[in-house]
């Protein structure tokens, strides 16, 4: 019987781009626009400039927003890091993960290096993006709870599959490439402790590693066929073992159902699960008017979000860096109430030291809601006690997701 890696390889190699439906291709173009805008907008950020100084003039590949040229690996690292750096990039509903940062960076770098056609780039995006989404569905929340960043560790597989699908690897070589990717995957979430920049690096590193895995396998380097389901495979290594796995998610309805079609696009520059609460807060700003009347705010949350976005509560109420603030739901609620928005400018050193914002974060607490549908649905509820009484505000789904999608003009507004 074929392993899951072999089954996926066989499907990917047989995929005919011309058979893809129009909506899927349109969404991928939407993704391209979003990611390219983010790469360019981050070009002068300190963390991007650190990488440019490290790798500049190492090759002949252009990176959007830079005059220097880079080699294949470093161009991918810079693009992927830039795309994800402000946490303004797409996410996947079903288990939060960022697909575009790695997959579009792969297209930008590998497209130049291998002189890929438009059809090849679309195929690589579909194949790699689909594998990332399906990996996220096998054991939702289990990777985060084990201390790993799904964007990073699944991104390596996605890029490997995307490149393998256009470099004419045989099914055997393709499965080996995925096996190799399992050993090149990395990315822990300890950045949460102090809001350091390693999370930003994850998609770039995944892109570089994934391309290497495919290129090595093309020259017949062997990797384990049982990389996903094996006793020492990806899920037994990177996912918390007390959470059930459904490996059939990797292959069920391949070619019929495309999960990559349902990527969500972010209206705010911060962690995915903070966003429904920001929408609630912005509406409450209009309803309450005088924010000083607020006595207490309680957020009803999904249990799986607490360890990343609510605890330790002292850090979340007083973020130690502007980057840490992006993963603090109390901070995000506070800026929604006070600023009425949550773009790039709201996550800077000035705002994280603003005493009015910090005073408000101290009034914000959470309660785990046993009926919360996370990770199947991303919602938010705020219960606010004011001098006049109680107000409840709900956001039933992620704005920008499949139930309430953004349109092209919404993406344009991000970059105006």
Feature locations, PLM:
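Terminal-appendage/accessory-domain detector
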Residues: 1-96, 198-208, 215-416
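Alpha-helical support elements that line or immediately flank enzyme active sites
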Residues: 35-42, 99-120, 155-169, 271-289, ...
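Short acidic/histidine-centered micro-motifs embedded in hydrophobic/aromatic stretches
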Residues: 54, 124-131, 177-184, 300
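Secretory-pathway/luminal and periplasmic proteins that interact with or process carbohydrate-rich
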Residues: 59, 131-139, 184-191, 306-308
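Hydrophobic alpha-helical hairpins/lids featuring a short glycine-rich hinge
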Residues: 82-140
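Active-site nucleophile and cofactor-binding loops and adjacent substrate-binding regions
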Residues: 95-101, 122-125, 143-156, 201-205, ...
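Amphipathic alpha-helical interface segments
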Residues: 102-104, 147-166, 176-249
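Structural helix-adjacent loops and short alpha-helical linkers that scaffold large soluble proteins
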Residues: 113-125, 168-175, 223-226
């Amino acid at each position: 019987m074929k392993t899951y890696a072999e089954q996926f390889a066989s499907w990917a190699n047989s995929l005919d781009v011309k058979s893809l439906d129009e909506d899927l291709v349109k969404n991928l173009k939407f993704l391209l626009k979003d990611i390219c805008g983010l790469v360019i907008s981050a070009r002068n950020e300190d963390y991007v400039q650190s990488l440019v100084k490290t790798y500049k003039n190492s090759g002949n590949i252009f990176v959007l927003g830079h005059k220097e040229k880079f080699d294949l690996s470093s161009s991918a690292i810079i693009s992927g890091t830039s795309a994800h750096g402000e946490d303004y990039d797409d996410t996947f509903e079903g288990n939060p993960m960022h697909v575009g940062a790695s997959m579009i960076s792969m297209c930008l770098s590998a497209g130049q290096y291998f002189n890929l056609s438009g059809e090849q780039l679309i195929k690589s995006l579909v194949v790699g993006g689909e594998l990332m989404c399906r990996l996220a569905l096998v054991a939702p929340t289990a990777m985060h709870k084990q201390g790993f960043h799904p964007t990073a560790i699944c991104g390596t597989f996605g890029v490997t599959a995307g490149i393998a699908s256009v470099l004419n690897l045989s099914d055997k070589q393709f499965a080996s490439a995925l096996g190799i990717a399992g050993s090149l995957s990395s990315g822990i979430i300890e950045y949460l402790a102090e809001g350091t920049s390693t999370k930003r690096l994850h998609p770039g590193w995944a892109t570089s590693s994934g391309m290497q895995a495919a290129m090595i396998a093309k020259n017949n380097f062997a990797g384990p066929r049982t990389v996903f389901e094996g006793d020492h495979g990806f899920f037994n290594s990177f996912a918390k073992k007390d959470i059930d796995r459904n490996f059939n998610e990797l292959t069920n309805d391949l070619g019929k159902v495309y999960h990559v079609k349902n990527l969500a696009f972010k209206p705010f520059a911060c962690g995915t699960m903070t966003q429904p609460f920001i929408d609630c807060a912005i509406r409450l700003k209009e309803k309450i008017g005088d924010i000083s009347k607020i006595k207490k705010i309680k957020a009803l949350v999904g249990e799986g979000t607490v360890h990343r976005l609510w605890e330790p509560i002292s850090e979340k109420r007083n973020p130690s860096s502007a980057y840490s603030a992006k993963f603090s739901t109390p901070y995000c609620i506070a800026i929604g109430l006070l600023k009425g928005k949550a773009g790039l400018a709201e996550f800077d050193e000035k705002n994280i030291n603003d005493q009015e914002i910090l005073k408000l974060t101290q009034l914000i607490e959470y309660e785990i809601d046993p009926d919360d549908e996370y990770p199947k649905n991303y919602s938010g509820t705020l219960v606010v006690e004011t001098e006049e009484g109680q107000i409840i505000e709900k956001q039933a789904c992620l704005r920008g997701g499949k139930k309430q999608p953004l349109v092209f003009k919404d993406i344009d507004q991000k970059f105006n």
